[in-house]
Every structure is written in structure tokens, then in C-alpha cells.
Amino acid sequence: MQAIHAVAASTQRMIYRVAAQTIVVEAQDAWAAKVIEELFAGWYVTPTTATRHMSIETSSSPGIAIRSGVKPPEIPRGWSQFEIAGGGTCFTDGKTSYIDLEGSLVAIGKPRHAAVEVWTNGMLEIQSPALTRVVTYALAAALRRRRLFELHSGAVIDPESGQGVLIIGPSGSGKSTLTVQLAAAGWSFLTDDVLLLSAEGAEVRAWPLRRCFAITAETFAANNFLRARASLDYMQAQPAGKRKFVPQRMFDSEFKEHCVPQTLFFSELAGANRSQVLRLSPGETMARLIRMNPWSCYDRSTAAEHLAVLSALVKQSTGYSLLAGKDLLDTETSANLIASYTRD
């Protein structure tokens, strides 16, 4: 495989491109290499060879080092600690952080050769949520050091105005449902769940991370477009009762590898029949972005750049609170509602 380069008898150096940046992963055993290959295949993290785009820092120092079957270092006593999403605990002294995830350990900013180091709790099942969570945290930390900042959001582009639209929210907020409805209505799409933000001069761009969409049975049942194209039984089962599918095989609309967001919807399920949309001030929009990006404060080595990107995103966009009602289970209603805020 072209992404793998031998470093030592048991170590492989793997080079990837993501959101126009290069990241090097050092897998220190064969199982770790297989994990990276299989999990990265589900994201827009593409194997490549060494290129002229690689800086001296990137080529000489891996962004991630991962291994199994090796005892992790002891977490220093007395460090500050806090709970993180997914059931883990982060320990930090302000410069170095350790994330404990069910016995697996992710070290960020440890003064060794890799920016992020991973010790898995044995050879976990490759498709297990536990292992995916470990690799996700490691990748997000490494990408922050490449000035790419993760955001839980769907992303689409209005076919008439060309505006990039982000549908932001945690799991269970309705962002995947609305993203699917808009893609079914002919809006170009990037992702329904996780994206990366980057600064290109004064402009902020959004890039998709996860390749597949994931929906609930309720969303599928309410979407005539999806039901005419596929059976729920043929979609791969996911945690929390969701099913995933490849959007390029489902929608007639076009996939885009990035967009410039100009409209932000912070989605939450309201349970009412009709949705409500409330305009947010720039300060309220920034506060909500920070709540959705806790590592903009937790990871001090990247906090200044992270907050600067969020601030630039606020300046180029308009933010809204979306109290999602049952009416968004209808494709036409969803498209008309969002279009009323993205078109003059």
C-alpha cells in the first residue's frame, strides 16, 4: 500500500492527506497499522506518499504514534482532571494532557518524538466504538496541530445562493436528519456529522471528515426519497440504533470537498410540530461555538489559533438557534425553511 513506509522491523510510517494538510502516523506494530488503515478508510483521510507539501517538521516527526500491547506511562499525580464526552477523563498540567478512555491512553504534547501518542488497551475490536473513540481523539488532537479544528456539524450548500450552511449540534440534535433532507432536496453536501474548520487567509473553510451518513429508522421512514432508493436492511448498523450509507450513492446532488460557511444553525430537538428559528448575536454565536468546541479552551497549545478560527467564522456568517420540530421530517418543508435564511 502506497501510504506505508517501513521505519523499523515492527514500525510503519503512514502518510495521509486531510483537508489540504499532511499528517504522518507511526504505527508501532502490525495491528496498529491495520487499525489506522481501516478506520481512516471511513473518513476523508487519504493515503499518499511523501510530497513537496510536507514541511521539515511534518516529515521528521509523526503527528500520531500508536501501539498495542505496551504498558502506557503513569499519569502524573496531582494534575487537574475533568470528564470528556464519550466517558473518558482528561488529566492536564496546562501543557501536556493525558486522556484515559477505558484503559486506553492518548497523550497530547508529551515531550517525545510524536505530537500525539496512543497506547490501546490491548488489541481492541477494530470496529468497536471504544477503539474508534480512541483514534478519533488522537486524530483530532493531531489535526489541531495542523490548524484543522473539529466541529460536530452537518454541512450543505444552497443550490441557488451558493451559501455554505452548517447545521451544528451534538448527537441527537437532529443535524443528520436535516442534512439528509436538504441533500435529498438537491443541496450539495459535505457531511452530516463531523467536519474540520481551517483558515485560508481571513476566510474560514469547512471540510468533511466522515465519509458515510448515519440516520435513525425514524428519519428513513419519513423520507420518501430515501425509501425509494434503498432498504434500511441494506444499511450497516451503527451504535445508538442508527444505520449508515454512502451519500454519493444515494443522492443526485453533488458532493463538495469544502465550502465557505455563511449561515450557521445550532440545532436542538424541540418536540413541537413546527420548528422555530431565532437569530443569534455574534456574541451568542461565538459562545455556542466554544461550547461545541471545548478543546478550544482545554488544549492550551492550540487554543489561540482555535479561538481565532471560531472568531473568523462568526465574522463571516450569521448564526441562528434552530428548535427543530417534527415538520423537518418533510423534505420540502426543511428545504423551504433553511432557504428562507440563505436567500435574499
Per-region residue spans from a language model:
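Residue-level detector of anion-binding/catalytic polar loops
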Residues: 188
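Conserved lysine of the Walker
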Residues: 175
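Active-site flanking residues adjacent to catalytic metal/cofactor-binding acidic residues
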Residues: 192
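A noncatalytic interaction/capping subdomain that flanks phosphate/NTP-handling catalytic cores
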Residues: 1-171, 184-185, 195-344
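Post-Walker A alpha-helix
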Residues: 178-179
